[in-house]
Amino acid sequence: KQENIQKSSSSVFYSLCKNIKNTEYISSSKIPCNFLVLHSIMYKEISYQSAEEALSIIKSGDRVYVHGSAMTPNFLLAELAKQAPRLQNVELTFISVLGDIVVDRPEYENNFHINCLFVSDSVRHAVNEGRADFVPVFLSDIPDLFKNGQLPLDVALIQVSPPDKHGYCSLGISVDIARAAVSTAKHIIAQVNPNVPRTHGDSMIHTNRIHSFVYSAHALHVVDYSAKVGKEELQIGKFIAELIDDGSTLQTGIGTIPDAVLKSLNNHKNLGIHTEMCSDGIIDLFEKDIINNSKKIIHPYKTVTGFAVGTKKLYDYVDDNPAFAFLDIDFVNDPHIISKNPKVVAINSAIEVDITGQVCADSIGSKLFSGIGGQMDFIRGAALSQGGKPIIALTSRTKKGEPRIVPFLKQGAGVVTTRGHVHYIVTEF
């Protein structure tokens, strides 16, 4: 059907769609760019509820998705904690959340069950104390858990921008798995925040898809990775910069080392970005036209990302910026999609690496620290890319002076990237 529609003229397609009401045609990142997608949705003014009223729909035994990263709806979560006395065994599932989510506190253990798909600082203690669960899963596979019914969602708690004149809100700087969550959840509660950037790509959701609206003008979470960059990270950044050719497509993971790499690329040309996460380090390279995405095959001239975490400067920069495409993570992190771009350089960090090349990136011994995330998605995608380079980067020692390149991984350590997938290991030496 897609093939037939693509062959038809826009006028014919419009005549087919113009009378359809209350139907939303969501463009998929995997549909070719020349595929015509029209929207014909009745828009009505939204009405706001109190958080207490909106959350009253949640009942015991429900599974609730929580929007993540800088878009964490902390205002809604704080109110949900107040409703704990009427609730039992409500499962909350998410990837990385920021700030105090309240519901993970010990006193709510019987009311709320945390099921993390990635372990962030906000829930690390709860996971390691056994009060919360962790599912080790590739980031690219998470949307299918929602879509295939393995993790059916009763409710989604999201944070969005106010609607535009056509009734569209934006999922802001965290589209990642949120796109799949809002597509499958039975009931959607939106925290509407004027501070949320309106981003391009797969971020739009129409108000007709949202069941409850709660207004909150809280500032978004910020993280300044550049402030944490030390001399060892800067040296690693310089070494990695030597491995990056002009015209490469970059994936930069989470942490200080990716930011240090970006600081070392001022003499490069025609770089592209296809990454699950972007931070402030890309802004200067954009303004110098070092990053222009001109050599990419997939979404040329656009920076492709799943989410952004950084300072307000970054959030203002991506706001209504058509040079950025915030897309569904099952597209962004698909190794086969990644590999279609030329010279993909995937830069990811590790906690510990043994001398055979096994990479522990999610735990310190048996203590869970983060998660699987998208490391393997991009390590594999870069390896399949023509001229690609999968890179694991870490300082040679911890802040306590303990070695991180070791004969054997600590007992209980998790292997995120196998020795068979490792191509480059970079330290400050």
Question: What would you call each of these model-derived segments?
Answer:
Residues S9-S10, P32:
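Compositionally biased low-complexity segments, especially N-terminal hydrophobic helices
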Residues E3-N4, N19:
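Compositionally biased low-complexity segments enriched in histidine and/or tyrosine
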Residues Q2, S8, Y25:
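Cationic, low-complexity basic patches in intrinsically disordered or flexible, solvent-exposed regions
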Residues Q6, F13-Y14, L38:
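N-terminal non-cleavable signal-anchor helices
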Residues F35, S40-F429:
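Conserved alpha/beta enzyme-core scaffold
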